[in-house]
Amino acid sequence: MARSLTWGCCPWCLTEEEKTAARIDQEINKILLEQKKQERGELKLLLLGPGESGKSTFIKQMRIIHGAGYSEEDRRAFRLLVYQNIFVSMQAMIEAMDRLQIPFSRPDSKQHASLVMTQDPYKVSSFEKPYAVAMQYLWRDAGIRACYERRREFHLLDSAVYYLSHLERIAEDDYIPTAQDVLRSRMPTTGINEYCFSVQKTKLRIVDAGGQKSERKKWIHCFENVIALIYLASLSEYDQCLEENSQENRMKESLALFSTILELPWFKSTSVILFLNKTDILEDKIHTSHLASYFPSFQGPRRDAEAAKRFILDMYARVYASCAEPHDGGRKGSRARRLFAHFTCATDTHSVRSVFKDVRDSVLARYLDEINLL
């Protein structure tokens, strides 16, 4: 009969083979214990929201605030993306001018526009002087400016006015993107992206899922072991339509997505952090685009950004409350989650640092206290 091994017995009672097996067993247990410690010490947050709500910008801010930031070499790598964003923006306005029947105001604008349209934005390798001169000329054209004011009628990157206002600097031969240039750069998120960093000795892993509808089916495997959900929504999209569907209002789609996510079983007891983003764009846009034109239930004054922000927050709060209500008339005791809402400007590092500190002090501290990690 083969004897059973008891590793607690005296070492000299074991054969060499048993000693080797015991050593391997101890090493495996040590590795498993270390993995458990790492898993216990790492907290995962899921970052969700519709496309262009600012999720990637938020991740970049976390890298600047809590990570290594962006070295000169890192920033240099964004140069072609900045050029691409500029060409995409100017070409979008040139095409929209024709569709909206807005004429150019300057004599040589058509010639400059034709030159800009010859470049494939996704094959840009440099920002050659003729293109830079053409864009600077066009950006001073009153027709282009009038088209920009009607940007809600076509798809235009939020960063367009920022980059076009800095063309002279960006067109320099030795151009290296600044941290702000990097934050403003836009590349659609596809698939799942993760970023890890530490806050007060706590390891955080933020999982960023693609915001476009075609990407949402890939989120499912990210839902497990999430301590909090961060949902980003744009305040400025109330008068815009989806890039994928020109008939669907972006804010209504975001509210519907928020509701869908809250109803998922994975989030029944997960705290929800709501970032209502792009306060700066809302404050600029509200002067020319009345919120009530798109959401008739808004009865606040025109051109009042604070009233608009409160109304939009209330819409999201009502969605949250409706998803938290029991469907059978009883209590949903299993739902111990809470909603933490913040207004943000993801391109403002100081603002994001302050907001994330509030998140850390509320949501993360609450969770760590519950599992006795504090």
Curated annotation (Swiss-Prot):
It comes from the Eukaryota. Gene3D superfamilies: GI Alpha 1, domain 2-like (1.10.400.10), P-loop containing nucleotide triphosphate hydrolases (3.40.50.300). GO terms for biological process: action potential; adenylate cyclase-modulating G protein-coupled receptor signaling pathway; calcium-mediated signaling; phospholipase C-activating dopamine receptor signaling pathway; phospholipase C-activating G protein-coupled receptor signaling pathway. This is Guanine nucleotide-binding protein subunit alpha-15. PROSITE patterns: G_ALPHA (PS51882). The keyword Nucleotide-binding applies. It comes from Rattus norvegicus. One of its GO terms (molecular function) is GTPase activity. Guanine nucleotide-binding proteins (G proteins) are involved as modulators or transducers in various transmembrane signaling systems. Residues 273-280 are annotated as: G4 motif. InterPro entries: Gprotein_alpha_Q (IPR000654), Gprotein_alpha_su (IPR001019), GproteinA_insert (IPR011025), P-loop_NTPase (IPR027417). CDD domains: G-alpha.
